[in-house]
């Protein structure tokens, strides 16, 4: 038995070796096949059968496969499970391969490397979320982060010190992160939920990056896009290099890069995003998040824009005010808002349709999406008219000027085109004469033959003339032998060409019939070929206007988000916040949008609360006390969410809101063990608190809940106390600080700007009623035992806890020492017995000599002599 692989398997192994780190989808007819380790891994991941095909080195070759027509669903599963997939297609027909020899293998090559950050297919993407590919680069003492969504063309870059990388990745949530080999970003990428791809250092060379980017955008210089640092160029260049690698030369439609300033958006770290559940609930799903509660967008582009605005609230006052003005205008025009939303709901996702067309992965439905989007855009622009609101006026302008392209697509496409161009049937009748004729031949071949037969009968006068078909002659004209003399004589013999004579019939053909036969036999293939040519022309026409079409797509998203904010504000009674450059934070009647939504579903009302952290230039801190379950955490979170909504450009759930720009938002609310890194809940809490104290500036908003609860009572109180003092003296920021340590309420008397607030409760016949009202003042009890009873602890445990609490409180009030005696009755708290006192030791000779001295009566010389004497005594002691 030979150890040499077959030619086909040798080809497979060569392609596999050229694409390390990826599963290889190897095209064989109607299937993508996988072999060896790839087959074993894919079969397990996809839950498909693992079979065998031949042998290699004496061992059976594992094999599995997936149908080409269903490949996308399998790709999605593999990508979600962390795999990369190289797709090797057949580059020629088997017939072409045979021309090179009977044993020649069909040429194959990888046409695409599918990775988490380079998806474009509709079935592989979440319509309402971006799919970012990010890149981090460092050049000397500079670092930068770039990110791109090749499914929409959005491309941005920003300076990014290493300390800011984790928060920025949390903001963008990329699916894949590119980094130089040895960058050691595994942990940061894992925290962000991104697949890490390490590239050679050459991919991050800033000089090569400039050349790559100029080639990508077909320009001589990047100066027209702005000035970029070497690190920014390196990060963007690595993306361009990676796209060239994964797309195999079919570069996506990428917009010119936009440079973001580091401080252009409210800074929100990963822990705060998680704690506030901005875009994802703690349970892992979208439901229960702020995004789910407020998303009333009706287009995919609008939904993606909303997620970006919530993830990165603006710090530009002009930008915030312009967005708010647009929302306010639509709030005042409910009829217009309803009409806009109805029209927008019929607008497809043009951004992603454009991207697929650019990558030659699009189909007729993508052309139809462009047609429908531009058509709806024109209607929306007409609705807005000459609107004077800047945001809406700019958007309306971008929706005009597309009439020629709309007319072209409308004329060329049927109303409901099929998914794939290869299936044909998407070009409208009347658009192309050749196609119409070809289709007529394909679909009405018998009718054409019948009409031609009638014409020939009229021309020859032979009523028995027939047009027939067989596999030898193809189509032919047949008459009985009695008409042979007439048919073979002039002038008919000049037109009717003799083909065959039998005993009873004579057969002819004509030039027209031969041409018709060829056209009929080739009509189906020709019709598909013509449609493919038309598809290519239409795609090019769209891509030639990719810039304006992309602007129109973004305009639709902007209008959709504005109308969605207006609909939300009108429906939920939200108000326009006053946002300025001050340090104010005054909320009247504030509500938590997610909790309020959940309560409404149950037919319950949310209790609104005020918050006032305005203290001029001094720190403004509320120290919030109150029982468990009273709503402290909800109050903390709702004020943070109100700040985010205000700076995102929307209205807020309150009666009135005045918010000075928030530069940073920090939240230390709730924690869990980080077992993977060996961190306890308390350690996680301390790490998050340290980040706040080390970073928060005087325009930050900080919310802290139960600092110090994970350790001993006095340790926890000490830490919480010190944290409060640091926030007040050093950070000097606006803060809400919730605690169960009632001793801390005394800080309000000695720290200017610190105020006590409490969540009110009422006791009624032994029951605790939570009022959920935040009032000025301090709580005197936590009602923990009552909450334990409500939670369902056994009555015996609740009664015992009440007794212990009573004794502890009595002892503390009276100073009798009873708490210590009580704790000694509890095994967990009983102190270990003190060791017996040791007997009194006998004094040494050195001690006796020192005691005999009077320091005031000896001279310097005597003191020096005494030192030598004492040293001699020490040396002589046993």
Swiss-Prot record:
GO process terms (BP): mismatch repair
Keywords associated with the record: ATP-binding, DNA damage, DNA repair, DNA-binding, Nucleotide-binding
One example GO MF annotation: ATP binding
PROSITE patterns cross-referenced by the UniProt entry: DNA_MISMATCH_REPAIR_2
UniProt entry tagged with the keyword Secreted: no
This protein's record includes keyword Cell inner membrane: no
InterPro entries reported for this sequence: DNA_mismatch_repair_MutS, DNA_mismatch_repair_MutS-lik_N, DNA_mismatch_repair_MutS/MSH, DNA_mismatch_repair_MutS_C, DNA_mismatch_repair_MutS_clamp, DNA_mismatch_repair_MutS_core, DNA_mismatch_repair_MutS_N, DNA_mismatch_repair_MutS_sf
Top-level taxon of origin: Bacteria
CDD domains reported in the protein's UniProt record: ABC_MutS1 (cd03284)
GO CC annotation: cytosol
Short name of any one Pfam family annotated for the protein: MutS_II
Binding-site positions, ATP: 626-633
Protein family (similarity comment): Belongs to the DNA mismatch repair MutS family.
Function recorded in the entry: This protein is involved in the repair of mismatches in DNA. It is possible that it carries out the mismatch recognition step. This protein has a weak ATPase activity.
Name of the featured protein: DNA mismatch repair protein MutS
């Amino acid at each position: 038995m030979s150890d040499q692989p077959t030619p086909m398997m040798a080809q497979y192994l060569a392609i596999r070796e050229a694409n390390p780190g990826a599963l290889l989808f190897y095209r064989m007819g109607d299937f993508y096949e996988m072999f060896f380790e790839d087959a074993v891994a894919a079969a397990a991941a996809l839950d498909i059968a693992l079979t065998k095909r031949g042998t290699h080195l004496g061992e059976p070759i594992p094999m599995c496969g997936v149908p080409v027509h269903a490949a996308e669903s399998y790709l999605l599963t593999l990508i979600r499970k962390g795999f990369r997939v190289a797709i090797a297609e057949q580059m020629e027909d088997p017939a072409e391969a045979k021309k090179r020899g009977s044993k020649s293998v069909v040429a194959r090559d990888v046409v695409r490397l599918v990775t988490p950050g380079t998806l474009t297919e509709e079935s592989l993407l979440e319509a309402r979320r971006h799919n970012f590919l990010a890149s981090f680069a460092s050049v000397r003492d500079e670092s930068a982060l770039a990110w791109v969504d090749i499914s929409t063309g959005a491309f941005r870059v920003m300076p990014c010190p290493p300390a800011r990388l984790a928060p920025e990745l949390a903001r963008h949530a990329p699916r894949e992160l590119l980094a130089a080999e040895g960058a050691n970003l595994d942990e940061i990428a894992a925290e962000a939920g991104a697949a890490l791809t390490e590239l050679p250092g050459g991919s991050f060379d800033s000089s090569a990056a400039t050349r790559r980017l100029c080639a990508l955008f077909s320009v001589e210089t990047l100066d027209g896009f702005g000035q970029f640092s070497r690190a920014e160029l390196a990060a963007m260049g690595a993306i361009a290099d990676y796209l060239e690698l994964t797309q195999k030369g079919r570069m996506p439609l990428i917009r010119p890069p936009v440079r973001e300033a580091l401080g252009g958006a409210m800074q929100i770290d990963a822990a705060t995003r998680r704690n506030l559940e901005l875009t994802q609930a703690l349970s892992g799903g979208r439901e229960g998040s702020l995004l789910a509660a407020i998303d009333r967008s009706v287009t995919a582009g609008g939904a993606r824009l909303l997620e970006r605005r919530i993830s990165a609230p603006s710090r530009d006052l002009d930008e915030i005010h312009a967005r708010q003005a647009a929302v306010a205008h639509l709030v005042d025009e409910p009829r217009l808002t309803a009409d806009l939303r109805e029209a927008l709901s019929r607008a497809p996702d043009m951004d992603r349709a454009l991207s697929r067309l650019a990558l030659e992965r699009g189909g007729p439905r993508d052309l139809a999406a462009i047609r429908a989007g531009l058509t709806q855009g024109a209607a929306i622009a007409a609705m807005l008219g000459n609107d004077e609101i800047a945001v809406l006026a700019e958007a309306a302008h971008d929706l005009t000027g597309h009439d020629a392209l709309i007319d072209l697509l409308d004329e060329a496409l049927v109303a409901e085109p099929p998914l794939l161009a290869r299936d044909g049937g998407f070009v409208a009748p009347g658009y192309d004469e050749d196609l119409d004729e070809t289709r007529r031949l394909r679909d009405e071949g018998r009718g054409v033959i019948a009409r031609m037969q009638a014409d020939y009968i009229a021309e020859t006068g032979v009523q028995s003339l027939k047009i027939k078909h067989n596999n030898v002659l193809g189509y032919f004209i047949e008459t009985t032998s009695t008409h042979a003399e007439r048919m073979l004589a002039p002038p008919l013999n000049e037109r009717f060409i003799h083909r065959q004579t039998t005993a009873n019939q004579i057969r002819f053909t004509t030039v027209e019939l031969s041409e018709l036969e060829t056209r009929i036999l080739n009509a189906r293939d020709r019709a598909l070929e013509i449609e493919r040519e038309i598809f290519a022309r239409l795609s090019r026409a769209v891509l030639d206007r990719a810039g304006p079409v992309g602007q129109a797509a973004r305009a639709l998203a902007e209008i959709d988000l504005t109308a969605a904010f207006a609909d939300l504000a009108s429906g939920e009674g939200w108000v326009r916040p006053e946002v300025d450059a001050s340090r104010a934070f005054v909320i009247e009647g504030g509500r938590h949008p997610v909790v309020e939504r959940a309560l409404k579903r149950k037919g319950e009302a949310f209790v609104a609360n005020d918050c006032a952290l305005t203290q001029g230039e001094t720190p403004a801190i509320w120290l919030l006390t109150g029982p468990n379950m009273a709503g402290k955490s909800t109050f903390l979170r709702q004020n943070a969410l109100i700040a985010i909504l205000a700076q995102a450009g929307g209205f807020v759930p309150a009666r009135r809101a005045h918010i000075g720009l928030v530069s940073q938002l920090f939240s230390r609310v709730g924690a869990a063990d980080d077992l993977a890194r060996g961190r306890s809940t308390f350690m996680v809490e301390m790490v998050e608190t340290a980040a706040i104290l080390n970073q928060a500036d005087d325009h930050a908003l900080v919310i802290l809940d139960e600092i110090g609860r994970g350790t001993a009572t006095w340790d926890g109180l000490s830490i919480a106390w010190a944290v409060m003092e640091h926030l007040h003296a050093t950070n000097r920021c606006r803060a809400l600080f919730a605690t169960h340590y009632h001793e801390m309420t005394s800080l309000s008397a000695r720290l200017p700007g610190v105020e006590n607030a409490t969540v009110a409760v009422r006791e009624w016949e032994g029951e605790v009623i939570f009022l959920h009202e935040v009032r000025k003042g301090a709580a005197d009890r936590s009602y923990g035992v009552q909450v334990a009873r409500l939670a369902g602890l056994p009555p015996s445990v609740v009664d015992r806890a009440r007794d212990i609490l009573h004794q502890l409180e009595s002892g503390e009030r009276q100073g009798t020492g009873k708490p210590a005696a009580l704790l000694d009755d509890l095994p967990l708290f009983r102190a270990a017995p003190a060791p017996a006192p040791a007997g009194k030791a006998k004094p040494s000779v050195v001690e006796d000599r020192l005691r005999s001295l009077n320091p005031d009566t000896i001279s310097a010389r005597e003191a020096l002599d005494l030192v030598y004497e004492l040293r001699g005594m020490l040396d002589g002691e046993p």
